[in-house]
Amino acid sequence: MKKFIYKYSFGALLLLSGLSGLSSCCANSYGSTLAKNTAEIKEESVTLREKPDAGCKKKSSCYLRKFFSRKKPKEKTEPVLPNFKSYADPMTDSERKDLSFVVSAAADKSSIALAMAQGEIKGALSRIREIHPLALLQALAEDPALIAGMKKMQGRDWVWNIFITELSKVFSQAASLGAFSVADVAAFASTLGLDSGTVTSIVDGERWAELIDVVIQNPAI
C-alpha cells in the first residue's frame, strides 16, 4: 500500500512540475516571464541561417565554396553578320540551284512537306545568305520559273509573310554594312529597266517588301 502511495505521489509531483514549467513558458503579460516578441524570433532565425556550413572548418573555404557554387549568368551572344559578296560577283550554279529549291519549296510544298523539308531549306538558305541582295533580286527577275514561284508564294499569306520578314532582316543587315552603294543601285535599276530614283528611294527607306514587289511586277524577261 505504501509503495502505491509513493508511486502515486511521485507521479503527481512530476505532473505538477510539468504544468508549472509549461505555464512559465507561455505566461502572458500578467505572468513573471514575457513571451518572445516577433523581433527576437526574427533575429534568432537570421542568426540560424547565417551559421556557416558544418563541413567548413575555415571561413575562407566557406566563402570560396559559396562563390564557385553560384550559377553564372549566360553571356548574350551577338548575331554574326553575313560577309556579303559584291554586287558584281556572279552567282554560281550551286547558288542558283539553292535559290530555286527554296522558292519552289515555299511555293508548292504543303505545310507538312515544308516542315519535313525544314532542314534542307535552312541549309540552302545558309548557303545563299551572303549573296548581295541586289544580285539575288536580279537572279529572281531574270528567271521566269522563279518569278512564277514568287507569285505563288504571294498567294500563300503565311509563307509570304515569313519569307518577307526573314529576307528583310538580311537586307537590313546589308544596308547597315553599307552594301547598297549608289553605283550598285543605279546599275541594278538599269539592268532591270527600272527608274533609278524610285529604286534609290525604296532602298534608302529600307522598304524591302516594296522592292521585291517591284521586281516581281517588272521581271527582266
Swiss-Prot record:
It comes from the Bacteria. A lipid is attached at C25 (N-palmitoyl cysteine). Keywords: Cell membrane, Lipoprotein, Membrane, Palmitate, Signal. It is a lipid-anchor. It is found in: Cell membrane. Residues 1-24 form the signal peptide. A lipid is attached at C25 (S-diacylglycerol cysteine). Its main location: membrane. One of its GO terms (cellular component) is plasma membrane. Belongs to the chlamydial CPn_0875/CT_734/TC_0107 family. This is Probable lipoprotein CT_734. It comes from Chlamydia trachomatis serovar D (strain ATCC VR-885 / DSM 19411 / UW-3/Cx).
